[in-house]
């Protein structure tokens, strides 16, 4: 693990430890975030900690053409129970995601600093959101970083206040991204939920080829 000063670049991701932890910084900025995503690195830390940067191996990814839609989701997709929008309520989505704990982690990792910097990237059209509505209520959503020049979407977090709402939003987003020519969706780390949607683990070196 390396401590990186604000003026320094990240070390090679091959220097990450066995858990994927690569570096620690005191700074978080839009420029630092963009450097990270283009190198296959993402931030994940708790409030009160320094910024921890990760590049796990293997890497959980979804190839859009491999999306799995369970039979139980068909009624949701064929009816009007939920409606989906894109980039309409980014701030509300990241706020709601901040109230959801990540698996195996106490507290939220979406700190005020995270919200501030991702909102700046949203204003630049780089951080994007998907909103799921039930009538006028925001019941689910997700956000991430869209590297359009690489045809890669980096998912960050999702939330759900109604059964299957976040899954509905994820499916709709993947379908949209596939139409736009996206080759890969970065899901970061393994979860059984993501696996059920068609995501798989690949070697980090294979993942990085999509960012070259």
UniProtKB/Swiss-Prot annotation:
<keyword id="KW-0963">Cytoplasm</keyword>
<dbReference type="Pfam" id="PF03588">
    <property type="entry name" value="Leu_Phe_trans"/>
</dbReference>
<comment type="similarity">
    <text>Belongs to the L/F-transferase family.</text>
</comment>
<dbReference type="GO" id="GO:0030163">
    <property type="term" value="P:protein catabolic process"/>
</dbReference>
<dbReference type="GO" id="GO:0005737">
    <property type="term" value="C:cytoplasm"/>
</dbReference>
<protein>
    <recommendedName>
        <fullName>Leucyl/phenylalanyl-tRNA--protein transferase</fullName>
        <ecNumber>2.3.2.6</ecNumber>
    </recommendedName>
</protein>
<keyword id="KW-0808">Transferase</keyword>
<dbReference type="InterPro" id="IPR042221">
    <property type="entry name" value="Leu/Phe-tRNA_Trfase_N"/>
</dbReference>
<dbReference type="GO" id="GO:0008914">
    <property type="term" value="F:leucyl-tRNA--protein transferase activity"/>
</dbReference>
<comment type="function">
    <text>Functions in the N-end rule pathway of protein degradation where it conjugates Leu, Phe and, less efficiently, Met from aminoacyl-tRNAs to the N-termini of proteins containing an N-terminal arginine or lysine.</text>
</comment>
<dbReference type="InterPro" id="IPR016181">
    <property type="entry name" value="Acyl_CoA_acyltransferase"/>
</dbReference>
<keyword id="KW-0012">Acyltransferase</keyword>
<dbReference type="InterPro" id="IPR042203">
    <property type="entry name" value="Leu/Phe-tRNA_Trfase_C"/>
</dbReference>
<dbReference type="InterPro" id="IPR004616">
    <property type="entry name" value="Leu/Phe-tRNA_Trfase"/>
</dbReference>
